[in-house]
């Protein structure tokens, strides 16, 4: 069973519908015990990292996520669900995040043009990730849908699975062991978004049982 975390994120219903469309067996929950025992975890998100962190902390989920990821539970973070994984964010003033992935959430550069980036843009899949199970059926250069003003400036270059150009070549997908996170919205990204979600479901089902 995939636990889709409900902390009040506005895109939760769309993420749930998209996962159900690709056949995922899921539960919508804000219960740390359910999240801890889930076969896989999805953290959706829109809005600001500070608000998201406050909600996760209030629900007792902020302490659980590092545990389940360290235990090898397949995890997918979406948009702000990706950003809160980092060490800190500069959005509305510096503040700490979950510190699961080393790095800082920074504002897209003014040279990008209109901020936030809203609309379709391409995934440039890194060569060493081109055969990863999450990218099955997703070509290099696939168009996906973004809505964001901030990006993840990660320290570990080796976990960057795809980049997207918008004033800067920012990480649009990161993968480390059984952790994956995407800056774009797969639930709004048409066939390629659904394919990525289906790939995540298959990837999580293929994961070895946790000991």
Curated annotation (Swiss-Prot):
Keyword line: Amino-acid biosynthesis, Cytoplasm, Glutamine amidotransferase, Histidine biosynthesis, Hydrolase, Lyase
Catalysed reactions listed for this entry: 5-[(5-phospho-1-deoxy-D-ribulos-1-ylimino)methylamino]-1-(5-phospho-beta-D-ribosyl)imidazole-4-carboxamide + L-glutamine = D-erythro-1-(imidazol-4-yl)glycerol 3-phosphate + 5-amino-1-(5-phospho-beta-D-ribosyl)imidazole-4-carboxamide + L-glutamate + H(+); L-glutamine + H2O = L-glutamate + NH4(+)
EC number of this enzyme: 4.3.2.10, 3.5.1.2
InterPro entries: Class_I_gatase-like, GATASE, Imidazole-glycPsynth_HisH
GO biological process: L-histidine biosynthetic process
UniProt pathway annotation: Amino-acid biosynthesis; L-histidine biosynthesis; L-histidine from 5-phospho-alpha-D-ribose 1-diphosphate: step 5/9
Cellular compartments annotated: Cytoplasm
Origin: domain of life: Bacteria
Gene Ontology cellular component terms for the protein in this record: cytoplasm
Record-annotated Glutamine amidotransferase type-1 domain positions: 1-210
One MF term in the entry's GO annotations: imidazoleglycerol-phosphate synthase activity
Catalytic residues in the record: 79, 185, 187
Quaternary structure note: Heterodimer of HisH and HisF.
Purpose of the protein: IGPS catalyzes the conversion of PRFAR and glutamine to IGP, AICAR and glutamate. The HisH subunit catalyzes the hydrolysis of glutamine to glutamate and ammonia as part of the synthesis of IGP and AICAR. The resulting ammonia molecule is channeled to the active site of HisF.
UniProt-listed NCBIfam families: IMP_synth_hisH
Entry protein name: Imidazole glycerol phosphate synthase subunit HisH
Organism, as annotated: Chloroflexus aggregans (strain MD-66 / DSM 9485)
């Amino acid at each position: 069973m995939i636990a889709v975390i409900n902390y009040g994120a506005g895109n939760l219903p769309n993420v749930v519908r998209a996962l159900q469309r690709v056949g995922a067996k899921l539960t919508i929950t804000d219960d740390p015990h359910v999240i801890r025992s889930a076969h896989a975890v999805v953290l959706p998100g829109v809005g600001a990292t500070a608000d998201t962190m406050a909600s996760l902390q209030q629900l007792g989920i902020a302490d659980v996520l590092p545990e389940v990821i360290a235990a090898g539970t397949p995890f997918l973070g979406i948009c702000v669900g990706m950003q809160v994984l980092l060490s800190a964010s500069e959005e509305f003033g510096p503040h700490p995040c979950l510190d699961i992935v080393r790095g800082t959430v920074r504002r897209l550069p003014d040279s990008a043009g209109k901020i936030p980036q809203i609309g379709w843009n391409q995934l440039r899949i890194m060569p060493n990730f081109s055969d990863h199970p999450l990218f099955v059926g997703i070509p290099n250069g696939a168009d996906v849908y973004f809505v964001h003003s901030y990006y993840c400036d990660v320290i570990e270059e080796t976990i960057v699975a795809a980049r997207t150009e918008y004033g800067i070549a920012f990480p649009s997908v990161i993968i480390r062991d059984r952790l994956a996170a995407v800056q774009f919205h797969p639930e709004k990204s048409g066939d390629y978004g659904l394919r990525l979600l289906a790939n995540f479901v298959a990837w999580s089902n293929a994961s070895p049982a946790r000991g």
